[in-house]
Amino acid sequence: MNDVPENANEDCPGATSADAGKAFSCTGCPNQTLCASGEIRRPDSDLLAVTDRLKNVRHKILILSGKGGVGKSAVAANLARALAVNDKIQVGLLDIDICGPSQARMLGVEQESVHESGDGWCPIVVKDNLIVMSIAFLLQNRSEAVIWRGARKNALIKQFLKDVDWGTLDYLLIDTPPGTSDEHISIVQFLLQAGSVDGAIIVTTPQEISLLDVRKEINFCRRTKINILGIVENMSSFICPCCSNVSQLFPRTTGGAEMMCNELSVPLLALLPFDSHMAKCADSGEDYFEKYHNSALAKEFEKLAQLISK
């Protein structure tokens, strides 16, 4: 339900409901008085600003994962690069992993700083048709820990949406933290209230310990009415650079992402092999597609970009 305040009680009828502030479930809710008075129904000027700012963004896609360490940010960065291989496609990448931002480093723009123009914050340009925004660009010390509570994180996410001059984009990929936290609830609420979101790509690795949390992520998407575009199984296999022999990195004790997708009726978008060259490029900020465009992993990312573009 898109009109439920983020700090509402569990069975909130919705701020625009005739029962808003009057239902039994409203008892004790911090918004009860506002809802009953009708004041909370007034348009949020910030959400109007988000709507206006994103009006020229054709597709908005969340990149999610149940666990950390599955390569979600690497998938987000390389999918953005794969989409941007076509110079006619304009791509933006928003990093809302507030406490652990990675995109500035992965995209080779870690030393850049955000500048403000008359139209708002200027995103960092990676190449002519690829831009990125992250809290990493706002920190004086790149090693500085971000120790924030939820409300402050939510405010920054809203600021990234309403104050960054995103311009005209074909795709805005949103790299989120692992799990389902304040950042996820906020970004979903802001995007749905301000317009729409195309859906989510969920990244996992083959082993059951990762798939367990992916099932929770799928449940989160279904409860928040976010379309699940599909699952990406990262580090699905290892291709030996010497003999091209394919082997498994992780045990598929329960059949991996493929079996889970069949069970839950969710699309399987890609099985991405592990490539140590990609890990090195992520650390150095080099463009993996420029250096290893004929690799098996690059070709899988190209297929993934084509699927997303359909």
UniProtKB/Swiss-Prot annotation:
Keywords associated with the record: 4Fe-4S, ATP-binding, Cytoplasm, Iron, Iron-sulfur, Metal-binding, Nucleotide-binding
Protein's UniProt keywords contain ATP-binding: yes
GO biological process: iron-sulfur cluster assembly; regulation of non-motile cilium assembly
Positions of [4Fe-4S] cluster 2 binding: 240, 243
UniProt remark on cofactor binding: Binds 4 [4Fe-4S] clusters per heterotetramer. Contains two stable clusters in the N-termini of NUBP1 and two labile, bridging clusters between subunits of the NUBP1-NUBP2 heterotetramer.
Amino acids binding ATP: 66-73
Protein's name in the database: Cytosolic Fe-S cluster assembly factor NUBP1 homolog
Pfam (any one): ParA
Lineage of origin: Eukaryota, Metazoa, Ecdysozoa, Nematoda, Chromadorea
Domain of life: Eukaryota
Principal location class: cytoplasm
InterPro entries named among the record's database cross-references: AAA+_ATPase, Mrp-like_CS, Mrp/NBP35_ATP-bd, NUBP1/Nbp35, P-loop_NTPase, YlxH/NBP35
Requisite cofactors: [4Fe-4S] cluster
Family annotation (PROSITE patterns): MRP
Purpose of the protein: Component of the cytosolic iron-sulfur (Fe/S) protein assembly (CIA) machinery. Required for maturation of extramitochondrial Fe-S proteins. The NUBP1-NUBP2 heterotetramer forms a Fe-S scaffold complex, mediating the de novo assembly of an Fe-S cluster and its transfer to target apoproteins.
